[in-house]
């Protein structure tokens, strides 16, 4: 075996000089015990000296496998890669939680027109109509209230006695006595009747407001609002599209950053 060593060395030297080099003389066999005598990346045989001063013939695949074993046995310590991956996981969770919240949010119920809603009380209808159609309701209410008060005052002037009626409905005796003994009984009588007729006055005001609103809309003085259901659907679709676009952009950015981090880590491993 020993007399073949010089011949083998000379052959390897010729092959090393004639063939192109891709990895240099000292490449992937740094973890093999013993000094490296000669190594070529394209050659299939590597000649090394063992710990007992014996010449060993190793293939390039074995050399690379011995190099990779210690790298696999000792993974890289947690550093920039794990830190960035942690940030990416947190951002993914935020995006998915925001999308889940947007999808889980129930749609707002369609609010009916207070002028046509019979499911609520008269006073609530009056308040909602005042908020939505205040510019129309206020003039109508003032006109109808004036008509109501004028009617009651005229009735009091004509000698209509409302005291028995007030006693019948159960008003306090203090109020009834004021109406009996007051010199200005006509005004107080008209006011008492005005307050008693409050439900009827509110009903007439709402009816007058409804008729006025229809008239103004038919002649183009008021814009007809779009249906609430269609409006809410359009808004929900727009919000959903915006959230989807933001999720895709965030996902692409995180994928690019993760790929760059992997490339950097693999490059560091190759350098080591």
UniProtKB/Swiss-Prot annotation:
It comes from the Eukaryota. Belongs to the FAM210 family. Residues 246-272 are annotated as: Disordered. One of its GO terms (cellular component) is cytoplasm. It is a single-pass membrane protein. It is found in: Membrane; Mitochondrion; Cytoplasm. May play a role in the structure and strength of both muscle and bone. It comes from Homo sapiens. Interacts with ATAD3A. Residues 117-229 form the DUF1279 domain. Keywords: Coiled coil, Cytoplasm, Membrane, Mitochondrion, Transmembrane, Transmembrane helix. Changing residue 82 to H: In a breast cancer sample; somatic mutation. Gene3D superfamilies: 6.10.140.1430. The chain crosses the membrane at residues 136-156. Residues 229-271 form a coiled coil. Pfam families: FAM210A-B_dom. This is Protein FAM210A.
